[in-house]
Amino acid sequence: MLNKVQLIGNITHDLEQQYINTNEGKIPKVNFQLAVNNKDTTQFIPCVVFRNQADNMFMYLHKGSKVYVEGTLSIEKYINNESENKTSTKVIVQRVIFLDNKNQ
């Protein structure tokens, strides 16, 4: 089975870094949204990145930064506070390439 997502877009908000507890200790995590432009529309894709790539994104990127991300699609089903069935979709990022010009 293949589950691979490749996107190029712009980060929609300044990044905030969090730390989560794991069996390996605390690891950095950054949630962000990527604006991906198509011909007529813009899609806003939720993404999450961990470990060193989260550190690097937090240090060097900001709202508007253009990036290439590669990862897997995660779909979670849950029941909200109103007892409605909901679905949450996000990209678990495994690779990030910064696409902005270094002089920007």
Swiss-Prot record:
The keyword DNA-binding applies. Gene3D superfamilies: Nucleic acid-binding proteins (2.40.50.140). Keywords: DNA-binding, Plasmid. CDD domains: SSB_OBF. GO terms for cellular component: nucleoid. The keyword DNA-binding applies. PROSITE patterns: SSB. GO terms for molecular function: single-stranded DNA binding. It comes from the Bacteria. This is Single-stranded DNA-binding protein.
